[in-house]
Amino acid sequence: VLSAADKTNVKSAWDKLGGHGAEYGAEALGRMFLSFPTTKTYPFHFDLSHGSAQPQGHGKKVAEALATAAGHLDDLPGALSALSDLHAHKLRVDPVNFKLLSHCLLVTLAAHMPAEFTPAVHASLDKFLASVSTVLTSKYR
């Protein structure tokens, strides 16, 4: 459960991304695909070469979904219900991939925002991403 301080940290960090959300989302996906090769089986025939439009486009979708989540911290299940259905029933993404992507996103944010990425912000973002992952995997059965 996110505390009031966690919610403040998440909203503040997300606000500081500015227009870089899609870029950081794509970078995090690239990190995940390179660091965890088994994740490459899920983005159905993505061209994973550097600068490819497919990971860039999916990175934008990831960033937009996380921005939606950051704006609805008190109702993550409601805000992410359609996305949870999509990943569980249509895409059938391995639930482990959400944890791996969360890790890669934390690394990406730390690399681009070192001054803002304090231990408290790190902990809050980690809890936030874990909560998002839990919601996205809630309809897997």
Curated annotation (Swiss-Prot):
Sites of N6-succinyllysine modification: K7, K11, K16, K40
Modified residues (N6-acetyllysine): K16
Residue positions, PTM Phosphotyrosine: Y24
Residues reported in the UniProt entry to bind heme b: H87
A Gene Ontology biological process term: hydrogen peroxide catabolic process
Positions of post-translational Phosphothreonine modification: T8, T108, T134, T137
Keyword set, alphabetical order: Acetylation, Heme, Iron, Metal-binding, Oxygen transport, Phosphoprotein, Transport
One Pfam family cited in the UniProt record for this chain: Globin
GO MF assignments: haptoglobin binding; heme binding; iron ion binding; organic acid binding; oxygen binding; oxygen carrier activity; peroxidase activity
Positions of the Globin domain: 1-141
Tissue: Red blood cells.
Chain positions with Phosphoserine modification: S3, S35, S49, S102, S124, S131, S138
Residues the record lists as binding O2: H58
Any single GO CC term annotated in Swiss-Prot or TrEMBL for this entry: haptoglobin-hemoglobin complex
PANTHER family (alphabetical): HEMOGLOBIN FAMILY MEMBER (PTHR11442), HEMOGLOBIN SUBUNIT ALPHA (PTHR11442:SF48)
Assembly notes: Heterotetramer of two alpha chains and two beta chains.
Family the UniProt entry places it in: Belongs to the globin family.
Function: Involved in oxygen transport from the lung to the various peripheral tissues.
Name this polypeptide is given: Hemoglobin subunit alpha
Protein's organism: Tamiasciurus hudsonicus (American red squirrel)
